[in-house]
């Protein structure tokens, strides 16, 4: 190997695109045509982008071909303040998963999934990813998941978890995730707030060259969620019984602690409940034997 090739890349220019052939050049020329302006350099484009914020970001939207079911009535309010944060692309409606999956060619590699072990590295094409996401989204719909429902994950950054996330986005549900190194109390603190109807997880986690059982923490998490839901159900029933037997008590209506308790119970009565747990088994090689696990 030549000496130059063995030198670290940090601080060295490894490639320079030809002048006039960069994607940014084509974008700048497009803005010049569509807005009848003269922007000869990148610096000119930057100045225009901060003086014509709405026009610039509309041009970016068009350039990257965002797919939307409803277009924005306004990109951003003129002279929008830094605080409170401005609302962007007002009225636009789009699906994140659709935009992620649409643009890649079928045979292009969409995901390179790696673990600590090189032999576990796998590549997934856009065609394969679309198929997996479609199947997972169909399964979520069959489980009754609708836009606005919450789907959670208690797993690692795996291909299966990515597919679950994109499927969740495809059906319009809310996604939240917790890293597998979280203990039960930390997971419960998060999930009792967001109330998932479906929980994705795994049976094992590979860390520092060893496989660690994950089912123990998962089962404890499920038990904790169900216990909280059972208590809330009992509270709701007790509240409903008291509400039915009580007369219209003006004192109760003006009693702030009672009003807060009543509001909490009414929220609990309508909150979503954990209904399904989906486990994606660890599919890498065993560190000890290089053999795939059964099941």
Model-based region annotation:
Residues 62-72, 142-148, 228-231:
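Surface-exposed helix-capping loop/turn segments at secondary-structure junctions
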Residues 2-84:
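N-terminal amphipathic, basic-rich helices that act as targeting or association modules
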Residues 52-60, 160, 164, 273:
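Residue-level detector of well-ordered alpha-helical segments, enriched
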Residues 170-295:
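Structural core segment of the AMP-binding/adenylate-forming
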